[in-house]
Amino acid sequence: MLVAVVKELKQGEGRVACTPENVRKLTDAGHKVIVEKNAGIGSGFSNDMYEKEGAKIVTHEQAWEADLVIKVKEPHESEYQYFKKNQIIWGFLHLASSKEIVEKMQEVGVTAISGETIIKNGKAELLAPMSAIAGQRSAIMGAYYSEAQHGGQGTLVTGVHENVDIPGSTYVIFGGGVAATNAANVALGLNAKVIIIELNDDRIKYLEDMYAEKDVTVVKSTPENLAEQIKKADVFISTILIPGAKPPKLVTREMVKSMKKGSVLIDIAIDQGGTIETIRPTTISDPVYEEEGVIHYGVPNQPGAVPRTSTMALAQGNIDYILEICDKGLEQAIKDNEALSTGVNIYQGQVTNQGLASSHDLDYKEILNVIE
């Protein structure tokens, strides 16, 4: 199987989907690997480093001729022209956010494997490290954009406690998963007060136990509680993600209007559509805008801003799956590995993820019923 590592076109995206170390694992297993020129530069990996591990350096167009194209994020619209029948595209594709790309993949007969929908032992194991990074970084961005020169309230989120008692900021975090706890931990480290809004009762108990000795309040998620708590936020971070599907707009414009002027609003799951009515995708180089008097931060690829850390994390997670696909062939790998099967969103043009099908009102096929 010919495997290609392509350079990301998404603005500000410095990650690469495969490290030189993982290229060596593939070539040692007898697979041919091509790497687009400068694909790894943003993460600190030179072309020479890939060549030393057995890869051939190629152009962007040549990379897309591969049987298996390994990416970090969804293909750019300029790359749709390279799709070919039975080609496998691997990455954090977040296909629920774009019907256009899904229809193009269906038209050509592409197979799309989305790392964010791979579930193993009840957990999104490939997404979790990226969620952790996005959560931590969101807390930091909330502090940064709270400053006056960025349009924020002009507050220092840590407060001041040297001979005076100026309280820190309040972070309201919507959702209680991996991204949420990582955001909360950074916020607590900044001496901020944290409120977590969570739906699941078992998770609420877990969070209450986890933060029993910390300045954290855990609140049951209801529309009424959300509307009440968001008014307290100096920084509001939404972490709600439904794997494979587009989430509902749970944070309404009226709720945003009720927030403090100059407060900061961040949606970590904006790459899947987000849960905030007033949010739209932004970029790492132009990350914020003001609406309803609130600073909106809608960067969909936050881990791409710290590519050295993020690339190492994602590469550790994806290589075993990629090797299994290459060694066994996709169909046998799917049959043998239930977790891998949950990542197949489109198989040869057929939608095989129920959440994705529902998001775009498309026909759904069970993956094990369509593989040969």
Swiss-Prot record:
Active site: 94
Coiled-coil regions listed: none
Record has Oxidoreductase as a keyword: yes
Top-level EC class: oxidoreductase
SMART domains named in the record: AlaDh_PNT_C, AlaDh_PNT_N
GO cellular component labels: plasma membrane
Lineage: superkingdom: Bacteria
Binding site for NAD(+): 170-200
Enzyme Commission code: 1.4.1.1
Molecular-function GO terms, alphabetical: alanine dehydrogenase activity
Recorded catalytic activity of this chain's protein: L-alanine + NAD(+) + H2O = pyruvate + NH4(+) + NADH + H(+)
InterPro entries the record matches: Ala_DH (IPR008141), Ala_DH/PNT_CS2 (IPR008143), AlaDH/PNT_CS1 (IPR008142), AlaDH/PNT_N (IPR007886), AlaDH/PNT_NAD(H)-bd (IPR007698), NAD(P)-bd_dom_sf (IPR036291)
PROSITE patterns, alphabetized: ALADH_PNT_1 (PS00836), ALADH_PNT_2 (PS00837)
Pathway the protein acts in: Amino-acid degradation; L-alanine degradation via dehydrogenase pathway; NH(3) and pyruvate from L-alanine: step 1/1
A biological-process GO annotation: L-alanine catabolic process
Entry keyword set: NAD, Oxidoreductase
NCBIfam families referenced in this protein's UniProt entry, alphabetically: alaDH
Family: Belongs to the AlaDH/PNT family.
Role played: May play a role in cell wall synthesis as L-alanine is an important constituent of the peptidoglycan layer.
PANTHER family referenced in this protein's UniProt entry, alphabetically: ALANINE DEHYDROGENASE
Protein name, per record: Alanine dehydrogenase 1
Protein species of origin: Staphylococcus aureus (strain Mu50 / ATCC 700699)
